[in-house]
Amino acid sequence: SRKFDFVIIGGGIIGINVAIELKRNYFDATVCIIEKECHLGEHASGRNSGVIHAGFYYDEDSIKAKFCKDGNFALREYCKQKNITINECGKVVVAKNHEELESLDVLLQRGKKNNVDLIEIDEHQLSEIEPSAKTFQRAIYSPNTATVSPTKLISSIKEDADNLGIK
């Protein structure tokens, strides 16, 4: 039987990163990831849309808002270091009717309170950013929302784990 100091259940992006942080903090420890799929990251992490969220959907001062904003920065830095392409596509949030304008206002306020760069745009500006999108009167543009290939990201993070001796 094999013995490990730490065993992580689940080899998705979170599990791999938890294993890496444990190994970095306890360098002499043995760390193992147990994954039900044949390879790490083959379940949800490898099949998601790869969105790097900006952090304006969450309430001010919430842990989710902090992690989202900090994670956006950290993931961008990691991708830059590893030469992983980031698709700087931005994101638009539109309103279908007058009632949904109130929801846009809530998101704008959350973004402001969370120190997230959001731009209120009109219908003409929206058509310049995304010609196929339609909105009622105005919309929100989030320039710091982006996407990254989940498979390339997982592959790179797995390589980091391998280099640290994680099993």
Predicted regions and their residues:
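Beta1/beta-strand and adjacent pyrophosphate-binding region of the FAD-binding site
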Residues: 2-14, 32
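Helical element adjacent to the flavin cofactor pocket in flavoenzyme catalytic cores
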Residues: 140-167
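Glycine-rich FAD pyrophosphate-binding loop
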Residues: 23-47
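Proline-glycine-enriched beta-turn/loop adjacent to the NAD(P) cofactor-binding site
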Residues: 12, 37, 55
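Short, hydrophobic alpha-helix immediately C-terminal to the catalytic nucleophile
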Residues: 16-20, 155
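Short amphipathic alpha-helical/adjacent loop interface patches that line ligand
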Residues: 37, 72-75, 161
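Dinucleotide-binding Rossmann-like beta1-alpha1 core, especially the glycine-rich loop
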Residues: 50-125, 129, 136
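Gly/Ala-rich phosphate-binding loop of Rossmann-like dinucleotide-binding domains
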Residues: 19, 23, 160
